[in-house]
């Protein structure tokens, strides 16, 4: 693995990450050029990490106790982003089936969304759940989905109510909407536009919709090194972590770049906070899983029964 380091752009980074912290390589060999490792998700009550191996159509499990990776599920419809709802159920964005699903506590699978206004979704990419139970997800249009009369012709960001009864289109002018994350107070929703190389930010209205007039570029993450904005997470103090050119960038809540985690693997695809204290930062890349430690806990995902 090439040189690994944590770069400080601003002294404020020292409160967030120790620049001498080790960046660990945990596993590799996933997906390769055909499709990346993606969607890391910490399963708190069981103490393991799930992640997607998209090309191999598998969900994998990393056990930090034994430091081993094992097959968790074979046959995922090439799922990408993962999260949990308020009951601790697994929510997955499935590429091949072009839908969002929920794994029930009894092991059955529920399709929670597969169309908008009678037209099939494109390829749902990433997903996050708000504290009121609403599910927000991105659905980029990609060239393999040649449009026909039943297809959507735009990339969308959506909000689905907890009862699954109302699906609202929030934004439709992204080139490729990808990772998304809320600020700690859920007053702001950050959404990547991967093709444009930046993160956009929207104020969230009391009804859960986005204030379109508040749309702004939060930060531009283009650069000469490999990598584009992809998966994204936020810590409890509002600092934003996102893959970009050359590694994982850390921004404060104003969008100021504080530093970069250069982990040596090409193209960071997604990140997740985990560990008992939510201070372990896991990341996936094209075919690699790694981690480092941070000083400020990430926003936890909901936790179910053990």
Which ranges hold each PLM region?
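Blade-edge beta-strand/turn elements of extracellular beta-propeller
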Residues: 11-28, 67-75, 106-118, 156-176, ...
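A short loop-to-beta-strand structural motif that recurs across blades of beta-propeller domains
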Residues: 58-60, 99-101, 155-158, 198-200, ...
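Blade-level signature of beta-propeller repeat domains, shared across WD40, Kelch, NHL, RCC1
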Residues: 269-306
């Amino acid at each position: 693995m090439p040189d690994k380091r944590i770069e400080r752009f601003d002294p404020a980074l020292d409160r967030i990450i120790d620049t001498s912290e080790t960046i660990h390589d945990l596993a590799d060999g996933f997906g390769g050029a055909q499709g990346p490792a993606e969607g890391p998700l910490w399963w708190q009550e069981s103490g393991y990490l799930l992640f997607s191996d998209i090309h191999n159509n598998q969900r994998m499990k990393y056990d930090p106790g034994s430091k081993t990776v094992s097959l968790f599920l074979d046959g995922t419809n090439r799922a990408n982003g993962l999260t949990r709802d308020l009951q601790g159920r697994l929510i997955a964005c499935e590429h091949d089936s072009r839908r969002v699903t929920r794994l029930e506590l009894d092991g059955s699978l529920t399709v929670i969304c597969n169309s908008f206004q009678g037209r099939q979704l494109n390829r749902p990419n990433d997903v996050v759940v708000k504290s009121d139970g609403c599910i927000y997800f991105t659905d980029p249009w990609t060239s393999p989905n040649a449009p026909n009369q039943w297809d959507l012709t735009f990339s969308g960001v959506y909000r689905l109510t907890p009862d699954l009864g109302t699906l609202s289109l929030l934004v439709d002018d992204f080139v490729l909407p990808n990772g998304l994350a809320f600020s700690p107070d859920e007053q702001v929703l950050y959404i990547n536009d991967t093709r444009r190389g930046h993160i956009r930010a929207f104020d969230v209205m009391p009804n859960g919709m986005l204030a379109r007039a508040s749309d702004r570029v939060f930060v531009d993450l283009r650069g000469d090194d490999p990598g584009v904005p992809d998966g994204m997470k936020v810590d409890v103090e509002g600092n934003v972590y996102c893959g970009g050119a050359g590694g994982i960038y850390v921004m404060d809540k104003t969008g100021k770049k504080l530093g970069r985690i250069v982990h040596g693997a090409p193209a960071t695809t997604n990140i997740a906070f985990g560990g008992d204290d939510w201070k372990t930062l896991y990341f996936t890349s094209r075919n690699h899983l790694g981690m480092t430690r941070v000083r400020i806990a990430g926003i936890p995902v909901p936790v179910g029964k053990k």
